[in-house]
Amino acid sequence: MAAYNKADLERRMKGAVESLKSDFSGLRTGRASTSLLDPVTVDVYGANMPLNQVATVSVPEPRMITVQVWDKSNVTPVDKAIRSAGLGLNPVVDGQMLRLPIPDLTEERRKELAKLVGQYSEKARIAVRNVRRDGNDQIKQDEKKNEISEDEKKRFENEVQKLTDKTIADIDALAVHKEKEILGK
């Protein structure tokens, strides 16, 4: 039985795309979204915890995020964590509720975010190419062990290349869409 596993390669390439989507969800586009605060961790109870484990995050208006902190003693650490997350948000504390007005993006900030989109998508492309290399290495090993013929080797390599091309096209489409969203085009 050959060790080349197309399903495993597909799963790993899909994982790179999902990771990219997750990275993109943290980029601010000028509209309020709860996913904007996903990367925020709060130092409470002697540990770093995700924000959604110490508060309820919601979007009551298109340009406002509210964070309802469950424990009053955590309001200050949550405020500090959001301010230091580098998201350009300044919470307004109102009891146990933090209101985060979403400011308009400056042209400079939009360009920075567009650059980040490029970096994130390149990281995903590299991950996909590494998966392709692993697949091709496995195919070559299978051929050396005489588990597959020369024709099968070529067919499998073509399968891997088609899968790679399709996945990279998906990544490029996601990047173009996110860039347009950020630049407001």
Curated annotation (Swiss-Prot):
Keywords, sorted A to Z: Cytoplasm, Protein biosynthesis
GO biological process: cytoplasmic translational termination
Entry GO MF terms: ribosomal large subunit binding
Pfam families found in the cross-reference section: RRF
A cellular component annotation (GO) from this entry: cytosol
Main location (coarse class): cytoplasm
InterPro entries in the cross-refs: Ribosome_recyc_fac, Ribosome_recyc_fac_dom, RRF_sf
Subcellular location: Cytoplasm
NCBIfam families: frr
Function field: Responsible for the release of ribosomes from messenger RNA at the termination of protein biosynthesis. May increase the efficiency of translation by recycling ribosomes from one round of translation to another.
Family affiliation: Belongs to the RRF family.
Protein name: Ribosome-recycling factor
Species this chain originates from: Zymomonas mobilis subsp. mobilis (strain ATCC 31821 / ZM4 / CP4)
